[in-house]
């Protein structure tokens, strides 16, 4: 009996020791952010007269908690990133609103059945490509989130398998079955459509190339994407990125004999027109360690000059109808809502982008300057970001944005300027 008790005790101790060793392979981090933002709304906006359509808050105070948990072994990896945010939104004369959100931004289980294979299931942020302005090769994240380092991209629900037969070559198959905002469905009322994607990546000594093909599980046609980058010497980086498909469900302005002079309709939803977005750029690192990026984006899904003029003509008519009591006010509101939610990530066709940043490893503040110019309507957006580590576990940050152009231009149609200031602390 004594021998049995000793054996049981030794077994319990072994299990406890194994569990402790497993915990030592994990990590945990808790970050708390507190920030305040103020927006300068365009007073004579044609798209958002009196802020009645977009209902943008003039100011917003937020407190957000970001918990990061990870456990990694040779055979599996588990990560979980729950988030919670409290918002106090200020709308001027209509009074403030409060909101409390909690969600899982990322949560992934990855298995490694063999050394060259990884199989994962859960919620993840799927980013690739070298571009700073936009990511045209990515069918999920064209908006790559790099304009504001303080904001996280929302994860999407995916199942993924990646096979790497060599260190240079990898093949990935993935299926996106949810948008990361709740129910996992193939097709939702809010317009979500499941997506299947195949991606091939090849890494050489100084170059990276990636190709992908994807399809939404609807009548949408396949989409193709590609990116490539190469380093020349120690200072110069050159890259290109693009996406291609047939047709688009985006809304385009059409003249109609109604009270607002037109409507926004899916002009190219059923045709075989090739829709592309292509970016070419480069980065050069100066002797000081600062890096300068210059990019050009061509996007034929955007409006031609005539469509852009018609877009704001219809918006102007709708705004005039809303200015006075009218039986056509509902139509005017619906028209402006369609103008703001037309399915286009960018309104125009040709853009120039400049970014300058310091070396993040430098002592002192980290900073980044960005400027985007619509080459057709002449409007632009300039932004500056800075972050100061004032203590090992505390940092201050600020983001300022300025817009220029007329009220019939892309970048200056809703906002004139905005500023965000805050602090982030690491509790764990």
Model-derived regions, located:
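Beta-barrel outer-membrane channel/assembly domains of diderm bacteria
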Residues: 14-119, 386, 399, 414-422
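Repeated loop/turn-to-beta-strand initiation elements of outer-membrane beta-barrel proteins
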Residues: 74-80, 116-119, 168-171, 204-211, ...
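Outer-membrane beta-barrel "beta-signal"
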Residues: 352-356, 388, 413-428
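Residues that define the transmembrane beta-barrel architecture of outer-membrane proteins
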Residues: 57-63, 100-105, 153-157, 192-196, ...
């Amino acid at each position: 009996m004594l021998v049995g008790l000793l054996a049981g005790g030794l077994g319990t101790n072994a299990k406890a020791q194994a569990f402790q060793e497993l915990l030592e392979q994990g990590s945990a981090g808790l970050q708390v952010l507190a920030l305040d933002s103020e927006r300068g709304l365009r007073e004579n906006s044609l798209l958002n007269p009196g802020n009645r359509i977009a209902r943008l808050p003039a100011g917003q105070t937020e407190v957000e908690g970001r918990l990061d948990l990870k456990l990694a072994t040779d055979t599996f990896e588990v990560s979980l990133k729950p988030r919670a945010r409290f918002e106090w939104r200020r709308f001027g004369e209509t009074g403030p609103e409060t909101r409390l959100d909690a969600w899982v931004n990322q949560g992934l289980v990855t298995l490694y059945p063999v050394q060259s294979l990884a199989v994962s299931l859960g919620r993840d942020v799927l980013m690739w490509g070298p571009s700073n302005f936009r990511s045209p090769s990515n069918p999920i994240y064209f908006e790559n989130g790099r304009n504001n380092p303080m904001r996280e991209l929302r994860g999407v629900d995916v199942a993924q398998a990646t096979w790497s037969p060599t260190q240079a070559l990898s093949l990935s198959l993935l299926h996106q079955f949810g948008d990361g905002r709740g129910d996992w469905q193939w097709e939702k009322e809010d317009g979500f459509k499941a997506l299947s994607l195949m991606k091939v990546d090849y890494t050489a000594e100084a170059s990276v190339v990636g190709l992908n093909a994807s399809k939404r599980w609807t009548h949408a046609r396949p989409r193709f994407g590609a990116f490539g980058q190469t380093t020349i010497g120690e200072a110069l980086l050159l890259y290109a990125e693009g996406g291609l498909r047939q047709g688009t469900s985006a809304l385009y302005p059409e003249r109609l004999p109604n009270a607002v002079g037109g409507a926004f309709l899916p002009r190219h939803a059923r045709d075989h027109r090739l829709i592309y977005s292509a970016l070419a750029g480069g980065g050069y690192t100066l002797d000081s360690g600062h890096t300068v990026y210059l990019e050009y984006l061509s996007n034929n899904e955007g409006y031609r000059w005539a469509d852009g003029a018609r877009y704001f003509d219809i918006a102007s008519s709708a705004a005039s109808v809303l200015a006075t009591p009218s039986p056509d006010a509902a139509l005017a509101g619906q028209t402006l809502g369609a103008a703001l939610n037309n399915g286009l990530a960018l309104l125009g066709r040709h853009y120039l982008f400049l970014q300058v940043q310091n070396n993040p490893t430098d002592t002192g503040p980290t900073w980044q300057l960005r400027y985007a110019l619509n080459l057709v309507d002449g409007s632009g957006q300039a932004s500056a970001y800075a972050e100061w580590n004032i203590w090992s576990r505390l940092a201050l940050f600020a983001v300022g944005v300025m817009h220029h152009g007329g009220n019939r231009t892309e970048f200056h149609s809703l906002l004139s300027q905005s500023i965000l200031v805050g602090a982030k602390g690491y509790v764990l």
